[in-house]
Amino acid sequence: ECKIKWHVVETESMCQSGQAMTDESLKFFNSISSAQKDLGNIDLLLTSSALQYCPDPIAYLKELLAVSAKYIYITRTPFFPGHQTLVSVQSSMLSQNGPGPLPQGYIDQEILYPISFVPIEQVEALIQEKYTIRFKVLEEPANLFVENQPVNAYYGFFCELK
């Protein structure tokens, strides 16, 4: 039997919403350090479509790597082939964010939020300081171009602690 302890790091408001689902195997935290303190050793750290929405994706990646989880899986994350981080504005409909229908009383409307495309070479170099990249996969080809350069190819990295 394998017991899984799932510690989710999210925004404060998402943590508050998640408290209703909290039990022995699922907990919500608003910081990496508080999740790690509660959990102790971490076998697998998963980040899915999150780094690009952090105010400083590289600093957040460094914080994730410092956890020293046995394995890290970075998935659904767009990277830039250039040498500098490209920051843009992403738009979506409110209903496209989160599972299920909009709560009663909410109006579906366009929302705007910042998104960062960090240089893939910089990310790989940071990872390789502490981890071995076991595989890297192109999950979704670029569909956004600036001056004929792809800026958002989505990659996945599965990494093992050295």
Q: Where are these predicted regions, by residue range?
A:
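A short acidic, Gly/Pro-enriched loop at the edge of an enzyme's catalytic core
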Residues: 33-45
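Conserved beta-strand signature within the Rossmann-like core of class I S-adenosyl-L-methionine
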Residues: 68-94
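C-terminal lobe and adjacent flexible extensions of AdoMet/dcAdoMet transferase-like proteins
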Residues: 157-162
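Class I SAM-dependent methyltransferase SAM/SAH-binding core
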Residues: 1-34
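Short alpha-helix
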Residues: 109-139, 152-156
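A short, conserved alpha-helix within the catalytic core of class I
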Residues: 53-69, 74
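A short SAM/SAH-binding and catalytic strip from SAM-dependent methyltransferases
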Residues: 43-57
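Acidic, Ser/Thr-rich peripheral helices and adjacent loops at domain boundaries
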Residues: 87-116
